[in-house]
Amino acid sequence: MILTTAAGYLGPAALGLAAAAMLANHRAVGLLWALLILLALLLIQVRNWFGLWSVLVSAAVVFGVSWWLQPQVQSAFAYSLTWFLLLAAPRPVLELQTQRRRRGPTLSDADQLARLTRVPALVWVGFFLVATVGALALGARWMVIAAA
């Protein structure tokens, strides 16, 4: 239960870091195919038509890029997706703390984790922030070194 609750905030950063590791090893096309596999697995969890549409369109775009475009474009696309994941990961954590500050303790994931573990919710928010910013810093370092 604890891992499931924490996964929503740490998942994008972890996926971005894994993608950065693949790019650091010059595996841009491999990253695109790994994303296709993850999108196919995501179809199991889709609960509505909008989710199905979103996953199928995303998969079609990733497939099209990985199959028909030039290697430079594939690499640029893979880097763009990775930067998006890494740069976007800290924002929900900041929004979580803003919501908690305005409304007080809520039913947020941090508050649920506090109830499950007896660790204060603010500590969980801090952990999420350190983990997502750390993943951003490490992933950025790997990608910048690989691109140089």
What do these predicted ranges mean?
Residues 1-44:
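Membrane-embedded helix-turn/re-entrant segments that form the catalytic/gating core
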